Swiss-Prot record:
Its EC number is 2.8.1.9. The gene is mocs-1. Sulfurates the molybdenum cofactor. Sulfation of molybdenum is essential for xanthine dehydrogenase (XDH) and aldehyde oxidase (ADO) enzymes in which molybdenum cofactor is liganded by 1 oxygen and 1 sulfur atom in active form. Residues 563-707 form the MOSC domain. It comes from the Eukaryota. The active site is at 367. The keyword Transmembrane does not apply. GO terms for biological process: Mo-molybdopterin cofactor biosynthetic process; molybdopterin cofactor metabolic process. It is an enzyme of class 2 (transferase). It comes from Caenorhabditis elegans. GO terms for molecular function: lyase activity; molybdenum cofactor sulfurtransferase activity; molybdenum ion binding; pyridoxal phosphate binding. This is Molybdenum cofactor sulfurase. Belongs to the class-V pyridoxal-phosphate-dependent aminotransferase family. MOCOS subfamily. The keyword Transferase applies. It catalyses: Mo-molybdopterin + L-cysteine + AH2 = thio-Mo-molybdopterin + L-alanine + A + H2O.
Length: 709
């Protein structure tokens, strides 16, 4: 698997996980707040972990405390919530772009993770200024003298991998700033030597370094800076004495005062295997050298890509000379892909193509809006305007008015190889530099009402993500075709779908005589018949596509049949509860596609129409329209049945699954991309009935009328 998201989370090695499993099978631990032998042993393991952490950063317990946290964000919030700012004298009207002098200030770089930026709202009622600055404000300009002030410094950009000079730590401290280092990205591939650099606070997460365990981080606090943060509340395990009837309480020693509740002691014990893994790799310096080498090679590969007209395929968001020096650049490349005409491919489109090739990377702004704004030329006004147009963090809106709303990020770790770069290059060559085709011209949208299409095929999918054999006639319900997406396969309580489990395409399901569910393997060698009237066991609520739906379990016999058919263990077939108003449909009750549009794709890639229909998994297929004209419809009627168009259907790598083999073939999605060009790879329209009445049916041969009003 070409994995290029080590900045998101690096991967644990097989040996590391095997060692953890062996340790867990033999190690019995208990709550370290207790005093019996197992609890005492656990406490010793926790304290040994603190010492090992300090050793890793080349310091000792004489110089730093180790507060164990949940993650980097948790550590940063501990500092911000408890930092002893001075007296607040005035309100903050805006975020400053320069550092302010005086008392009680917060500063951070524009290139900061949202976990840093969000601290401004933690301290807003305590400080006199909040400043968001660039590195030059620290290294090249005079820093104003301050007291009782905190600067949260990014060690390495999680957006583009730029390493910020740790000289800033000393320069800020000389002027009275306490410095909290956000080291989350930096420590994943670089050594932080605390005998050379001495921030007041350092926050990081261990999964960034080891890949496993998750949910464990640390806040290192310089002992001569411990007086800068003061705990004013308490929780379980943090007090020496407390009285519930008065405000009296006395906190424990420094580290334990900030470690609220019971520590994740099993996770802490597993840190040992993470440190051993780093040593097996030759130490963090060897990892830095490996990842720097791979990152440089990836950069050179990306820069070499040209369209036939000579224009670059890749726009890179870093200065190339930084990649020559591992002290200035971490193992991250942020970029976007460009069209031959100079426009941009949306990063969602790129991500879908990567999924076909099995490449895993990150897209978006990576929780770093400041860097995103700088490198993509986005303004504060554009952010708010984009929000009004529906843009949200983590969604698929990747271009607005032709401008990218985010980028593509690749990043390397200790398990990375040249193969990862080769796979990315093959994907770019196949999908974005070769086989460029002109988008097909579409008919005048106003002509749609002059056509007289009819329904030619109908499909219902009783089991979500499983195939259908189709029928000529279906009864309608308030939630779509009767029995459509009424069943769902889960494995160890995880929902199976085609995107993650393409073997589901080897099954088909249909309702026979309205009273039996027939499940067959694709070759029809095995089948299972389930009476629809079967009394089922309540299985509780199930979260499907953001909806919580009450379900019932179809029993052990069905589960065992699915285990055999899918070569899995612990499969279960769930059915929507009888009184549920929802089924397992993702977006809309019906998906309608145009047979002529299917035919155009069929001719283009030499794939049979029937196979394309199978891959597109529509409910309704109409005949008698020019290709792609259905995009212009707002409403339609199928004889006396009225429907409204909800949205276009944006396609993903699911249509690339070969129903005969379960393997992924990118040709169909590539053809769709070329035909649609800048239409977001949509195909088909989602529709919803607006005049439903009990007893209605939809059948093949019915006439269809479209409206663009």
């Amino acid at each position: 698997m070409p994995y290029l998201d080590h900045a998101g989370s690096t991967l644990p090695s097989k040996i590391q996980l095997e060692e953890v499993a062996k340790q867990q099978s033999q190690l019995i631990l208990a709550n370290p707040h207790s005093h019996h032998a197992t609890a005492v042993k656990t406490k010793q393991i926790v304290n040994s972990a603190r010492l090992r952490i300090l050793q890793y950063f080349n310091t000792t317990s004489d110089d730093y405390f180790v507060v164990l946290t949940n993650n980097t964000t948790h550590g940063l919030k501990i500092v911000a919530e408890n930092f002893k700012f001075g007296q607040k004298t005035h309100s903050i009207l805006n975020i400053a772009s320069v550092l302010h002098g005086g008392s009680s200030n917060l500063g951070y770089l524009y290139d900061s993770h949202h976990s840093v930026v969000g601290l401004r709202h933690v301290v807003n009622g305590k400080v006199n200024s909040i400043s968001c600055v660039n590195e030059e404000s620290i290294l090249e300009h005079e820093i104003p003298d301050v007291e009782h002030s905190l600067f949260v410094l990014t060690a390495m950009s999680n957006f583009c991998g730029k390493k910020y000079s740790l000289e800033s730590v000393h320069r800020l401290q000389e002027k009275g700033w306490a410095v909290c280092l956000d080291a989350a990205s930096f420590v994943s591939s670089s050594a932080l030597d605390l005998s050379q650099q001495r921030p007041n606070f350092i926050a990081f997460s261990f999964y960034k370094i080891f890949g496993y365990p998750t949910g464990i981080g640390a806040l290192l606090v310089r002992k001569d800076s411990a007086h800068l943060i003061e705990k004013t509340s308490f929780a379980g395990g943090t007090v020496q004495s407390v009285d519930e009837m008065s405000m009296f309480f006395v906190l424990r020693e420094f580290e334990r005062a900030f470690e609220e509740g019971t520590l994740n002691y099993y996770g802490i014990a597993q840190l040992q295997k993470g440190f051993e893994e780093i040593e097996r790799c030759g130490g963090i310096s060897s990892i830095r050298n490996l990842t720097h080498h791979l990152c440089k090679n990836a950069l050179y590969m990306l820069k070499s890509k040209k369209h036939p007209n000579g224009r670059p395929v890749v726009e890179i968001y870093s200065q190339s000379e930084q990649f020559e020096n591992p002290d200035k650049q971490g193992p991250i490349v942020a970029f976007n892909l460009k069209r031959p005409d100079g426009g941009y491919y949306g990063y969602t489109e790129v991500e879908k193509m990567c999924a076909i090739f099995g490449i895993e990377l990150r897209t978006g702004c990576f929780c770093n809006i400041g860097a995103c704004k700088k490198y993509l030329g986005i303004t504060s006004e554009m952010i708010q305007e984009n929000m009004s147009k529906g843009k949200r963090c983590g969604d698929e809106i990747d271009l607005i008015n032709g401008t990218p709303t985010g980028a593509i990020r690749i990043s390397f770790g200790r398990t990375s190889t040249e193969h990862d770069i080769t796979a990315l290059e093959q994907m770019i060559d196949t999908c974005f530099t070769e086989g460029e085709h002109q988008a097909q011209s579409k008919p005048d949208p106003m002509n749609i009402e002059s056509y007289s299409p009819t329904v030619v095929n109908l499909f219902s999918f009783p089991i979500k993500s499983v195939g259908s054999v189709g029928r000529k006639r279906y009864e309608l319900t308030a939630r779509g075709f009767k029995n459509d997406r009424e069943f769902l396969i889960v494995n160890d309580d995880v929902t199976l779908n085609l995107k993650t489990h393409p073997e589901l395409c080897m099954l088909t399901a249909t309702i026979v005589d309205d009273d039996q569910l027939l499940i067959q393997t694709f070759d029809q060698n095995e089948n299972l018949v389930l009476p629809m009237s079967l009394s089922l066991k309540d299985n509780g609520a199930k979260l499907v596509c953001k909806n919580t739906i009450a379900t019932m379990d179809c029993g052990d016999k069905v589960g065992k049949w699915l285990d055999n058919a899918l070569d899995r263990q612990n499969c279960r077939l769930l059915r929507v509860a009888e009184d549920s108003k929802k089924n397992f449909v993702n977006d809309s009750p019906f998906l309608l596609i145009n047979e002529a549009s299917v035919y155009m794709l069929s001719r283009y890639i030499n794939m049979e129409v029937r196979e394309i229909l199978t891959r597109f998994r529509s409910n309704i297929v109409v005949r008698g329209l020019p290709p792609f004209i259905e995009d212009t419809a707002k409403r339609l009627s199928i004889e006396n049945l009225e429907f409204e168009v909800v949205d276009k259907c944006t396609r993903c790598e699911m249509i690339c699954v070969d129903p005969m083999t379960g393997e992924k073939d990118p040709s169909l999605l590539l053809a769709l991309r070329d035909y649609r060009n800048k239409q977001k790879m949509t195909f088909g329209i989602y529709i919803r009935q607006t005049n439903f009445e009990s007893g209605q049916y939809l059948e093949s041969g019915m006439s269809v009328n479209f409206s663009t009003d």
